[in-house]
Amino acid sequence: MPNQEKMEKAIYQFLEALGENPDREGLKDTPKRVAKMYIEMFSGLNQDPKEQFTAVFSENHEEVVIVKDIPFYSMCEHHLVPFYGKAHIAYLPNDGRVTGLSKLARAVEVASKRPQLQERLTAQVAQALEDALAPKGIFVMIEAEHMCMTMRGIKKPGSKTITTVARGLYKDDRYERQEILSLIQKG
């Protein structure tokens, strides 16, 4: 569980280390605001993305299910600055086992609300889906802009990083994987 008081003290000291006066008018409530913001932004730390799949149904559906353009934001664990973008999730049900569509978005939400790497985020979403449904195939694609590349260092705003995880049929069958990519890329 996050310790808000400890976070506030650390942020206060950080402002002092910058040469700022944390007690001045514009900054006096900043340690509290920043601590509350980080508690919200890292609220996925004590949650398991797999636990978001609370609704699993047996349906007579054996074709692909795709939810795309799921917006998310996360925090780069290397610099503690945001990266944000869209997640696309596809799965091929096994024995008609499907989940509520919002559960896919909830899994992305939980996995992204922690200090994170995009590669790990992609894998965690795929693993949660695999654990919950054991589908015949899984394909997760995440496209994101990283503020650590936009605001600092190389300073390349607008550049996107794309990560994918393919499992089951979508890993083993190149044709099936290409079909999923085509469906995701359609407007």
Curated annotation (Swiss-Prot):
What SUPFAM superfamilies does the database record attribute to this sequence? Tetrahydrobiopterin biosynthesis enzymes-like
PROSITE patterns, per database record:
GTP_CYCLOHYDROL_1_1, GTP_CYCLOHYDROL_1_2
Q: Which InterPro entries match?
A: GTP-CH-I_C/QueF (IPR043133), GTP-CH-I_N (IPR043134), GTP_CycHdrlase_I (IPR001474), GTP_CycHdrlase_I_CS (IPR018234), GTP_CycHdrlase_I_dom (IPR020602)
Q: Would you name any one GO CC term?
A: cytoplasm
Coiled coil region boundaries = none
The GO annotation for biological process reads:
one-carbon metabolic process; tetrahydrobiopterin biosynthetic process; tetrahydrofolate biosynthetic process
Q: Which residues bind Zn(2+)?
A: C76, H79, C148
Annotated metabolic or biological route of this protein = Cofactor biosynthesis; 7,8-dihydroneopterin triphosphate biosynthesis; 7,8-dihydroneopterin triphosphate from GTP: step 1/1
Domain of life per record = Bacteria
Classification via Pfam families: GTP_cyclohydroI
E.C. designation(s): 3.5.4.16
The record's catalysed reaction(s) read: GTP + H2O = 7,8-dihydroneopterin 3'-triphosphate + formate + H(+)
Which UniProt key words apply to this protein?
Answer: GTP-binding, Hydrolase, Metal-binding, Nucleotide-binding, One-carbon metabolism, Zinc
Q: One MF term from GO for this chain?
A: GTP binding
| Transmembrane regions listed in the UniProt entry | none
Under Gene3D superfamilies, the record lists:
1.10.286.10, 3.30.1130.10
Q: Does the keyword Nucleotide-binding apply?
A: yes
Q: Assembly and interactions?
A: Toroid-shaped homodecamer, composed of two pentamers of five dimers.
Matches recorded under NCBIfam families: folE, PRK09347.1-2, PRK09347.1-3
Question: PANTHER family given for it?
Answer: GTP CYCLOHYDROLASE 1 (PTHR11109:SF7), GTP CYCLOHYDROLASE I (PTHR11109)
Q: Which family does it belong to?
A: Belongs to the GTP cyclohydrolase I family.
Q: State the name under which the record lists this protein.
A: GTP cyclohydrolase 1
**What gene is it encoded by?**
folE
